[in-house]
Structures are given as structure tokens and as C-alpha cells.
């Protein structure tokens, strides 16, 4: 077991704190101004465990958030987790105990997701999003399968539309496979033709699990707070697993998350949309191939160089700039970099200029060679 390619680059950064590193690697949107939150309680919050399912304050805030999206569930259908990855692990361990043996993921998929599922002994298959979603390949799945699908998709930004989502949910009810919907970018759907809240179409939550978090949707990865939406009986079982695996999520973090949930995230969505326009214009001006994403907090750019790992190495060496490449995904390729669009505009512009300069030099070197 080893760190991901991005994790290795960030470890190199941590080992050289004297260097003026700049990080363009994380697709977490950054608040233009820190959100105005009330001071969170006293020492008492840290001197007691929260309920394993989550605090009443946060569960109610999440219920209201989902109601605004058209997702009609009660607090009994919600479980607070230590982020979306924690939720995925809870669900996957629960499902393997129920006999699930194969995981099918819409690809490319984060390397960490594939590794997590594979480490549980699952047979992990990763068809491309167009093959799986466009071809509606879920019709071949059954009770021994888990289908993991995120919309907006990381990294391509593709999203489910209403007709496809209805077909997916009908197939899940008919065929009995487990469906895990990763919704960690659901506040950032840009295409009017895309479905902003697929769970609003779920008629029966049995076998369906929604994942979400405050990391991307609220720009707060340090809180390590996420949530699962599921059938109430499954929430009871997952809450029991939460209790004996980690007891509960931090009470203080849940209080901050509840405030963020009530505050909303409009400054983040506006910044991400502006960043999308900037990156798309830059890519076209520099001859880089890119499909406008339907959603998400980044743009998946085909950099036009023979090897994006070499590009990333050069950016670190020459500009002290860290980027994420397609090696961070499975199956890996050598063509793409992931450009976050929710960062400070001047930093984004400066970083794109560095990427342009190094990419052009590498392209010229490849042509001469």
C-alpha cells in the first residue's frame, strides 16, 4: 500500500516547507471571504460524545437542505459520517457482509475509491462513463453487485439527466443491485439539461445509498463531515457499524457544519462558475482539448503533452506548482490534468500561465525528438 501520485507530491511539499509552494491540486472551492459562523460552544462540546447517528441540529439542517432539493426524507434516513470516503467505506463493508462481491464504477474513478473497494475483496470493474451510463449497462447487474456512480462525475464533469436517472432507479428496483450515488459536487451543476438532484427521483430507498460531504459543497474539508442518505432500516444498521467502528463524528465539527448548511454556499458556486469560464477560455486559446463539464469544481484538460506526469514534475521543479494528473485516477492515462476552478482568480490565472509555458516547451521538445 502506498500514497496516491498526488499524495506523494504533497508529501514532497511537506518535506520542503521552506520552498514557496503553490497548490493547484485540490478541487476544493475556496471562499472569497471566510464564512461568518458563530463561535462554536464551550469545552462541553469536546467533553462528550455526539450521538452515533449525528447531532439533532445537523440532521435537521441536512433534512431541510435535501427538502429544498426535492428529496423527501426524514432525519431517520440520514447518518452523519467523517466525510464521503468514510461513508463509502461504511457502506461497502456493510454490503460485503450482505454478499456483494463485485463493484462497478463509472470511470475514470478516483484511485482511492478503486483501492478501497478492491481492498475489501471486491472485483472492481471500471467502464468509462459513456459506456456505463450512455449504454445503460446496469441492465446486466444483479443482487451481488454494487454500482458506484458520482454525478457530477469526477473527473469529467458529466451528469445524469432525468431520463437516464429514471431508467437507473427502475433498473435498481427490478434487478436488486446496490446503488451508491456520490453527490459531493451536487451544488455545482452548470448545465440546465443535467439533473441537479438525482435522489429526488428515488421512489424506494431500499438498496440505494446517497453520499455527500461538506468538503466540496461547502469548501470545508477540514471539518471531515459528510452524510449518508438511505432507507431508515439501513441507516439503523450503518449507525450500529458507525458506533462500533468509530463511535461518532466530532460534536464541534457537526455544529460548524450545521451553520454552514444553514448559511448556504452561493459565494462558492459563483466563484466556481467564473473559474470554469476562465479555464475553458484559456484551454481553447492554448490549443488544449477540453469538453465543457456539466458540473463539478474543476475542468478535465487534455494538456497536449506526451506525459502529464512529466508536466507535473516540471511544474514542481520550475514553478513550485503542484497539479493533479490523470495518474490520480483508475484506469490511469497520461493525457489529462485536473484544473480546479474554485480558487482565487489571480492565483488561477498565474498557475495557468505556468502550465501553458511548460506544456508548450514539452510539446516542442517532443516534436524535435
From Swiss-Prot:
One example GO MF annotation: transaminase activity
Residues with the N6-(pyridoxal phosphate)lysine modification: 216
EC number(s) on file: 2.6.1.125, 2.6.1.126
Key word Transferase present: yes
InterPro entries in alphabetical order: 3metArgNH2trans (IPR030898), Aminotransferase_I/II_large (IPR004839), AspAT/PAT-like (IPR050596), NHTrfase_class1_PyrdxlP-BS (IPR004838), PyrdxlP-dep_Trfase (IPR015424), PyrdxlP-dep_Trfase_major (IPR015421)
Keyword entries, A-Z: Aminotransferase, Pyridoxal phosphate, Transferase
SUPFAM superfamilies: PLP-dependent transferases (SSF53383)
Keyword Transport: no
GO biological process, one term: amino acid metabolic process
Database matches in PROSITE patterns: AA_TRANSFER_CLASS_1 (PS00105)
Cofactors: pyridoxal 5'-phosphate
Substrates-to-products reaction catalysed: L-arginine + 2-oxoglutarate = 5-guanidino-2-oxopentanoate + L-glutamate; (3R)-5-guanidino-3-methyl-2-oxopentanoate + L-aspartate = (3R)-3-methyl-L-arginine + oxaloacetate
Superkingdom classification of source: Bacteria
Group of enzyme by EC: transferase
Pathway(s) where this gene product acts: Antibiotic biosynthesis
Physiological role: Aminotransferase involved in the formation of the rare amino acid 3-methylarginine (MeArg), which is incorporated into the peptidyl nucleoside antibiotic arginomycin. Catalyzes two rounds of transamination: the transfer of the amino group from L-arginine to 2-oxoglutarate to give glutamate and 5-guanidino-2-oxopentanoic acid, which will be methylated by ArgN. Then, ArgM specifically catalyzes transamination from the donor L-aspartate to the 5-guanidino-3-methyl-2-oxopentanoic acid produced by ArgN, generating the final product, 3-methylarginine.
Family per record: Belongs to the class-I pyridoxal-phosphate-dependent aminotransferase family.
Protein name: 3-methylarginine biosynthesis aminotransferase ArgM
Amino acid at each position: 500500500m502506498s500514497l496516491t501520485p498526488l499524495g506523494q507530491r504533497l508529501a514532497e511539499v511537506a518535506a520542503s516547507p521552506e520552498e514557496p509552494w503553490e497548490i493547484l491540486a485540490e478541487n476544493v472551492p475556496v471562499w472569497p471571504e471566510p464564512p461568518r459562523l458563530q463561535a462554536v460552544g464551550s469545552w462541553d462540546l469536546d467533553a462528550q460524545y455526539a450521538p452515533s447517528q449525528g447531532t439533532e441540529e445537523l440532521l435537521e439542517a441536512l433534512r431541510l437542505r435535501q427538502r429544498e432539493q426535492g428529496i423527501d426524507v426524514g432525519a431517520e434516513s440520514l447518518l452523519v459520517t467523517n466525510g464521503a470516503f468514510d461513508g463509502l467505506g461504511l457502506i461497502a463493508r456493510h454490503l460485503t457482509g450482505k454478499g456483494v462481491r463485485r463493484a462497478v464504477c463509472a470511470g475514470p474513478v478516483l484511485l482511492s475509491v478503486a483501492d478501497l473497494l478492491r481492498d475489501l475483496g471486491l472485483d472492481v470493474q471500471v467502464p468509462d462513463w459513456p459506456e456505463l451510463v450512455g449504454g445503460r449497462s446496469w441492465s446486466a447487474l444483479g443482487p451481488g453487485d454494487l454500482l458506484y456512480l458520482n454525478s457530477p462525475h469526477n473527473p469529467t464533469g458529466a451528469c445524469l439527466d432525468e431520463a437516464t436517472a429514471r431508467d437507473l432507479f427502475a433498473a435498481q428496483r427490478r434487478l436488486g443491485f446496490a446503488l451508491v450515488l456520490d453527490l459531493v459536487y451536487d451544488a455545482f451543476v452548470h448545465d440546465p439539461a443535467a439533473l441537479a438532484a438525482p435522489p429526488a427521483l428515488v421512489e424506494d430507498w431500499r438498496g440505494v445509498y446517497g453520499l455527500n460531504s461538506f468538503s466540496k459543497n461547502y469548501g470545508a474539508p477540514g471539518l471531515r463531515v459528510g452524510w449518508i442518505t438511505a432507507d431508515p432500516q439501513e441507516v439503523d444498521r450503518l449507525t450500529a457499524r458507525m458506533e462500533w467502528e468509530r463511535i461518532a463524528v466530532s460534536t464541534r465539527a457537526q455544529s460548524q457544519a450545521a451553520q454552514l448548511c444553514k448559511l448556504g454556499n452561493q459565494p462558492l458556486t459563483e466563484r466556481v462558475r467564473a473559474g470554469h469560464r476562465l479555464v475553458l477560455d484559456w484551454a481553447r486559446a492554448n490549443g488544449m482539448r477540453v469538453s465543457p463539464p456539466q458540473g463539478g469544481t474543476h475542468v478535465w484538460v487534455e494538456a497536449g503533452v506526451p506525459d502529464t506526469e512529466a508536466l507535473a514534475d516540471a511544474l514542481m521543479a520550475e514553478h513550485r506548482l503542484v497539479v493533479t494528473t490523470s495518474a490520480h485516477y483508475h484506469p490511469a492515462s497520461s493525457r489529462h490534468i485536473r484544473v480546479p476552478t474554485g480558487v482565487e482568480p489571480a492565483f488561477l490565472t498565474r498557475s495557468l500561465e505556468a502550465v501553458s509555458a511548460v506544456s508548450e516547451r514539452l510539446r516542442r521538445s517532443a516534436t524535435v525528438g
